[in-house]
Amino acid sequence: YKDDAISSVEHRANLVLLLKYGMDFIKNYTMSGWVKMPNYRLNLPDYSDRAIFEGLVNHLIHRDYTVMGGEVHIDIYDDRVELVSPGAMLDGTQIQDRDIYKVPSMRRNPVIADMFTQLDYMEKRGSGLRKMRELTEKLPNFLQRKEPQYQTEATSFYTTFYNLNWNESGRIPIEEVANRVNSTLEKYPVNEKSSVEKFGVNSKSSVKTFGDTPEGSEKGSEIMQKGSEKKFGDSKNKSKS
């Protein structure tokens, strides 16, 4: 119920601003924890920011704008974030009954889709649903059955993102999450060979990026430190609605 919500906001603006306002709202009411490991800092966000960005773009682009009074809703709960927009699947099928890796791209609003493609907010090949899952599964604290879920009804499309740091008992202690992740890393260590296979990065490419001089190493360290502070900052311990 609306009266039970901690915060309720409505926006009327162009699509680019609506995307910004939506992301700001979600970031304000979700958390990104971290824990200091022996040799590094481990970030443990509730959600993948990029996956949620992809989801919000998907809902803004593919919603049915012929539905008068229709809106894109963002509902934030303790254990999940739900995005809802008017408009079911164009071919009349139910997305929950489909293999998302075999769903062809069908654009309800091609002009809007082209605009977002030009802004580099989406890809032309229509991989949004797959990308949301892949981005979530890459997080270190990902658990099975916590991948984004999609559902369609007669006139609506739903995307649900599950809080990776939450279970039936409430918020999972950050140390418990860190220990689980650390055990996984010990079982499946990341070495130079696996880094090359997955990311194309090795010691030579690192030297090429930052230089092999003390000044280059110091500069690279400084860049990494500033980037980390800018991206993660202090955790916001706010309530959600």
PLM regions and their residue ranges:
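C-terminal regulatory or interaction extensions
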Residues: 1-241
